[in-house]
């Protein structure tokens, strides 16, 4: 049985390699804008993860494989913060997160192409930022680390200096909650 990661994220690839030695990466072309946030964080990220996994399943014709889709988003005061479109949006995101608690949700969808079975779940982690002044935000943005990251920061990089507290799974904030993924794959009979 082949394991396939439906993601372009180098962070997810790196994390998955801690659980599984050999897997294939197939980038999903799923249109993330087709999923509209309707107030339920867990539902939103699971729909995105499932969309990515389904898209990759369609690309894999006649192959026995298990496809892993994942999506991570930041939520502040009931609003979703995805990946910033530009440096200005990144600045506003970090300014909003400054001194506040926010939730990071990851949705996971695992599809078994042979059994035509899908398992979905999510993980929530609460993160509290220190107060960050404009100068610090601008210096951080110059590093370019904010690109392609929900909420415009990477906890595993320099963005981690903004984090005052974390409650929940650290790997969820990085982009792939390993404990949840391990339990889901084990529950599907995948030997890890």
Swiss-Prot record:
EC number, UniProt record: 3.6.1.9
Top EC group: hydrolase
Catalytic residues identified in the record: 71 (proton acceptor)
Pfam families: Maf
Gene Ontology cellular component terms for the protein in this record: cytoplasm
Keywords (A to Z) from UniProt: Cytoplasm, Hydrolase, Nucleotide metabolism
Intracellular or extracellular location(s): Cytoplasm
Swiss-Prot/TrEMBL cofactor(s): a divalent metal cation
Top-level lineage group: Bacteria
Protein's UniProt keywords contain Methyltransferase: no
Catalytic activity: dTTP + H2O = dTMP + diphosphate + H(+); UTP + H2O = UMP + diphosphate + H(+)
Residues under site feature: Important for substrate specificity: 11, 72, 156
Keyword Cytoplasm: yes
GO molecular function: dTTP diphosphatase activity; UTP diphosphatase activity
One GO BP: nucleotide metabolic process
Protein family per UniProt: Belongs to the Maf family. YhdE subfamily.
Protein function: Nucleoside triphosphate pyrophosphatase that hydrolyzes dTTP and UTP. May have a dual role in cell division arrest and in preventing the incorporation of modified nucleotides into cellular nucleic acids.
Protein name as it appears in the record: dTTP/UTP pyrophosphatase
């Amino acid at each position: 049985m082949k394991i396939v990661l439906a993601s372009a994220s180098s962070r997810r690839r790196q994390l998955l390699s801690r659980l599984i030695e050999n897997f294939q990466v197939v980038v999903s072309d799923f249109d993330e804008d087709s999923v509209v946030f309707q107030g339920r964080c867990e539902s939103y990220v699971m729909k995105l993860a499932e969309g990515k996994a389904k898209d990759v399943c369609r690309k894999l014709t006649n192959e026995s494989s298990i496809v892993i889709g994942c999506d991570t988003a930041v939520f502040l005061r009931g609003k979703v913060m995805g990946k910033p479109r530009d440096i200005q949006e990144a600045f506003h995101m970090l300014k909003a997160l400054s001194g506040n608690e926010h939730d990071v949700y990851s949705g996971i969808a695992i599809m078994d192409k042979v059994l035509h079975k899908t398992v979905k779940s999510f993980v929530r982690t609460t993160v509290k930022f220190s107060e960050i002044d404009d100068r610090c935000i601008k210096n951080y943005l110059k590093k370019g680390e904010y690109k392609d990251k929900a909420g415009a920061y990477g906890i595993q990089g320099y963005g981690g200096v903004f984090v005052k507290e974390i409650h929940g799974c650290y790997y969820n904030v990085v982009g792939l909650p390993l404990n949840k993924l391990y339990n889901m794959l084990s529950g599907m009979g995948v030997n890890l």
